[in-house]
């Protein structure tokens, strides 16, 4: 589920919230999954991956990740991203273009402290996108981390939030006979 904090009253945000509720009412699975595409300057290619959108606060759309991951270095070197959401339950696609940046340490700390112990152990123990010998190694690291964690275990500095602020929205809704609706909002 996405948490809406101080939702922006501009039209694309209100439209998104309305579609989100409609998709939720229609049983959309994985409703918080969004595809974020970034540019890999080293390989001169675009890469996409799914992340879980956690918050929309004013103009900021926020998810959390490992700051040592390949996507993190891509965000650092090229802050332009493209976002895609598809909700099959209402045949709706939402595209966004945005600039991305890290959230404050305080916001990341607050979110980390509100998560389950297991999720935090995974964030701490995961060597995201690194080559490993086997999945057994992942499970071992996770279980060892879980055993030593306490409620006071702090957020690791290599894990935290990312926030993007869309300047372009495209809402596409499929209809019969390909008579589809498309609404575009762009900040000029």
Predicted regions and their residues:
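Binding-site signature for planar aromatic cofactors or substrates
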Residues: 1-188
